[in-house]
C-alpha cells in the first residue's frame, strides 16, 4: 500500500516517514507548497490508501477532492505507542518510497526507490562524508525534497543529532540554531 505524507518539517514528519518505511508500505512524500493541480496529479499517479497530514492541509485535500479514495489520518490525533515487538519482513528490492520530480521540463514524474537503493545511498554518503554519532545536522531544507530527506536519513543512520527547521525560510532562526549547536 502507498501511504502519502503531507506534513511540514517536524518530529511528526519523521515519525510518520520512518513508520511507513518500517511497516513495509510505500511512502509518498508530498511537498507542503504543492499546487492544487500537482497534488491531484501526484495522488492520481501514486494511488495512496492513506494520507497522513494535519488539519491545516486537510482543507487543501478536501478542496481538491483528494480524500475520496483514501483514508485521512490526522497526525494531531495520533497516540504514539512503543511497539518494540513490531518487525515486518522487508524485501530489499521492494519499493520503499515514491519521490516526484520537480517537473521543470514537463509533468512531474514519480520515481520509485527500493529499500536497497535508499540503504545503499545512505551508506555511501555517510561513509564518504564520515558522518558519525558526534555530528549535528541543521536541516533547513524541506524534508519533501530529496536532499533534505537524504540529510535526515544520513544523520539518523549515523546516530547523530538532527535539528529540523519547520520554517525553512526563517534564516535568522537557522543561523541561531547553527550557533547554538
Briefly describe each language-model feature range:
Residues 3, 20, 51, 95, ...:
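Conserved S/T- and glycine-rich ATP-binding loop of Class I adenylate-forming
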Residues 96-123:
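Conserved AMP-binding A3 loop
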Residues 1-34, 140:
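Conserved AMP-binding/adenylate-forming
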Residues 7, 28-44, 55-57, 160-180:
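ATP-dependent adenylate-forming carboxylate-activation enzymes
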Residues 82-100, 106-107, 130-136:
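Conserved pre-ATP/AMP-binding loop-to-beta segment of ANL
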Residues 50, 55-93:
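ANL superfamily adenylate-forming
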Residues 24, 104, 159:
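Conserved G/P- and acidic residue-centered "switch" motifs that form tight phosphate/ATP-binding loops
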Residues 119-136, 144-181:
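Conserved AMP-binding/adenylation subdomain of ANL enzymes
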